[in-house]
Amino acid sequence: MTWFTPDVIDAIIAVVKAIVVLLAVVVCGALLSFIERRLLGWWQDRYGPNRVGPFGMFQIAADMLKMFFKEDWTPPFADKVIFTLAPVVAMSALLIAFAVIPITPTWGVADLNIGLLFFFAMAGLSVYAVLFAGWSSNNKFALLGSLRASAQTVSYEVFMGLALMGIVVQVGSFNMRDIVEYQAQNLWFIIPQFFGFCTFFIAGVAVTHRHPFDQPEAEQELADGYHIEYAGMKWGMFFVGEYIGIILISALLVTLFFGGWHGPFDILPSLAFFWFALKTAFFIMLFILLRASIPRPRYDQVMDFSWKFCLPLTLINLLVTAAIVLLNTPAGSVQ
């Protein structure tokens, strides 16, 4: 009797895939900080980081060494357990959310029938990390930043979910692979669900606290917000987690609205990973371009925009989509 039964082999393959995806996402998140600084320098007609190594390519290594050797300081007035737990929860929730994203027809950590719901569960968990960080720091700026962040995230997650319900109504499934295959047989959802795409993208920028929705950590107002008391590797986990969030939202946009691993007009279907990576990189660049080009609105304007514009738009989009699907459904199949 051998231990290497088909079930054991499948489990080993699943673990290896999970480790590879985990390492790739963390490395890409770290590299993205350097890429962002170089792109911002290029777009703003100035030099980016160019001192460490040729063309500044080793800047990320220098930053990692500096962060690794910094004192891992915990304020004496902080709640030490929750203070330490907050960055771990923040980064873990984002990494676990990648489990349901199908990268190619054969690559993906988990093929869940409730893939979209799993993503929203992990997104909701990240709110607790922000609250933990702000409250446990025992700092008024950190607490105010965490309250801003939690209110903003909860507000935008409401219509982030509603923006995707039009897709669920059309496909009839929460499974990510089913959504990708549906787009391969029909139009990419960027066309029939254009308003859903716009609102989901806006919500994605807001829940990752990226510019112009970075009020929770606005340096001019809150002195870096809810991670003002963090240093060393704890701060680094929040920092890299922000870029991992950008990659996650970009990958979701590609999966849900741009055909996933399929190329336009099914060009070169054998290059599934290339198409997925290319489209994801485009949206990552768009995130960075927003930081370089759009001013930051006031916090009350951000909240008004969420509840008074985006929420009604997503509800109208969902109602219209449901009506069209119902009218196109044969009478005998309606239960």
Swiss-Prot record:
One Gene Ontology biological process: aerobic respiration
User: Hey, which family's this protein in?
Assistant: Belongs to the complex I subunit 1 family.
Task: Return the GO cellular component terms, semicolon-separated.
Answer: plasma membrane
Q: Which PANTHER family match?
A: NADH DEHYDROGENASE SUBUNIT 1, NADH-UBIQUINONE OXIDOREDUCTASE CHAIN 1
NAD: present as a keyword of the record?
Answer: yes
MF-aspect GO terms: NADH dehydrogenase activity; oxidoreductase activity, acting on NAD(P)H, quinone or similar compound as acceptor; quinone binding
Q: Kindly list the residue ranges recorded as spanning the membrane.
A: 12-32, 81-101, 114-134, 154-174, 187-207, 238-258, 270-290, 307-327
In terms of domain of life, where is this protein from? Bacteria
What topology does the record note for this protein and the membrane?
A: Multi-pass membrane protein
What is the gene called?
nuoH
Q: What does this protein do?
A: NDH-1 shuttles electrons from NADH, via FMN and iron-sulfur (Fe-S) centers, to quinones in the respiratory chain. The immediate electron acceptor for the enzyme in this species is believed to be ubiquinone. Couples the redox reaction to proton translocation (for every two electrons transferred, four hydrogen ions are translocated across the cytoplasmic membrane), and thus conserves the redox energy in a proton gradient. This subunit may bind ubiquinone.
Location in the cell = Cell inner membrane
The record ties this protein, via InterPro entries, to: NADH_UbQ_OxRdtase_su1/FPO, NADH_UbQ_OxRdtase_su1_CS
Keyword flag Membrane: yes
- Give the signal peptide, or none: none
The protein depicted here goes by the name: NADH-quinone oxidoreductase subunit H
